[in-house]
Amino acid sequence: MKIAFDAKRITHNATGLGNYSRFVVNSLSTSFPEHIYQLYTPGKGKEALRKRIEERPSVSFHYPEGRFDKLFPSLWRTSGLTTTLRKEHVDLFHGLSNEIPMNLKQNGIPAVVTIHDLIFLRYPQLYKPIDRSIYTYKFKQACLRSDKIIAISRQTMRDIRDFFHIPESKIEVVYQGCDPIFGQAVQEDVKSSVREKYQINGPYILYVGSIEERKNLLLLVKALKALKEDISVIAIGKHTPYRIR
């Protein structure tokens, strides 16, 4: 089977959607090496990120080729790519980050899209109206045009159902994977050294992610106050003005 992916996040995003996209491709190519994996991205992006894709004969990167497509890579990603996929006789397209090209169904190309969240609809006050409109259109169209939707959580599944009126039968909840590094044992002396360095005493919850309002870290802090047990929160991520709250 020849499987094509929207690989923009693979080459452009170091965290979040990029990590998810790279994990999916690496895991599939490792577990199912008999298939062909073609990664389509509007630009080469960052070399360091491309190198995080494990080198295998079955995995290859593809970029815009025609002059027009090179001049307008965003347009190529949303529409021109379909022509390329048809010529390549792709068996399946997977939009890894909330979007798929137009006219896939009309060209006989089955499609799957991963929807990560609809936070711009659940917390609209955190987004500009123009951004909400663009996201809503893109995400909803991807859900309507795809043959199957992957939701990374049950909450995302419910949001897709409620906001876009998509039947649950079209949605599969597939939780995100975990990098192999988290399966490596850590020596006790290393743990002690980290605790001492950051003055950590007792049990704690580790939060990894940007410290901003839409992540709702404040709710976690408030919830811990209601517990009798003394548990700390260790937050690792980019600081924003939200931090002072």
Question: Where are these predicted regions, by residue range?
Answer:
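Carbohydrate transferase catalytic cores enriched for Leloir-type hexosyltransferases
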Residues: 1-245
